[in-house]
Amino acid sequence: MDTILTVSQLKKVYGGRGSRTTALDGLSFSVSAGEFTGIMGASGSGKTTLLNCISTIDRPTSGVITVEGTEVTALRGKALSRFRRERLGFIFQDCNLLDTLTGFENMALALTILGTAPKAIERRVREAAELLGLEGVLDKYPYQMSGGEQQRVAAARAILTRPALVLADEPTGALDSKSAGQLLRQLSALNQGEGTTILMVTHDAFTASWCRRILFIKDGVLYRELRRGDLDRKAFFAQILGVVSLLGGDSADVL
């Protein structure tokens, strides 16, 4: 499989002399096309900093991040903005839908910004709505949708530009268990059916069990890696809990 994401010797240090905090300490890994990879770790482990660096929200102190052969850490200005719009998709804990736009309009926004032809926007929005079971909310405003529907609209928006990589930061954090399960099933279907490459940060072992591979971060370095392989989700969940118990610290920060 082609490598979509490469993180090499990534380091992120906050603060100055006398007050320096190392969030990432030479972290390296890669993600292949079509993988559904989870990032787990206790509070302060560096997992959110890692996602912020990959998403170009933050810049690393040193190291290299490459997405589809493009060295993201070397991009600046308009080139960086264009790369972010075209090659990365984002799903956040807060779905960030615009209250004055319908579900259709919220989903179409990224394509509109890219200057996509109206007919192509119409076709791709309706295709994404069918994939994610959103046909019934296209004409609704966010306040008329459930939390799970809002988050699935955000997920549809993230994939409409056909990005190389979808970055999800605690996407189920604000959802009840039923809505979280629906979203995770849809993300899994996108990954397996459409080959969407997903990198998801989560503190929740149940959420992580939907991934095919988990990277555990501790003190800014890669602590351990799990692959689901032929395991069913229940068995993989048990494996995840086993590693979490070895991470140390406050388990409530991870589970």
Predicted regions and their residues:
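Conserved beta-strand-loop-alpha-helix hinge in the C-terminal portion
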Residues: V221-S245
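ABC family nucleotide-binding domain
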Residues: I4-L5, L10-I217
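Generic alpha-helical segment signature
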Residues: T3-I4, R233
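Intrinsically disordered, low-complexity regions
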Residues: M1, S32, F237-A238
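Non-catalytic connector elements of ABC transporters
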Residues: S245-L255
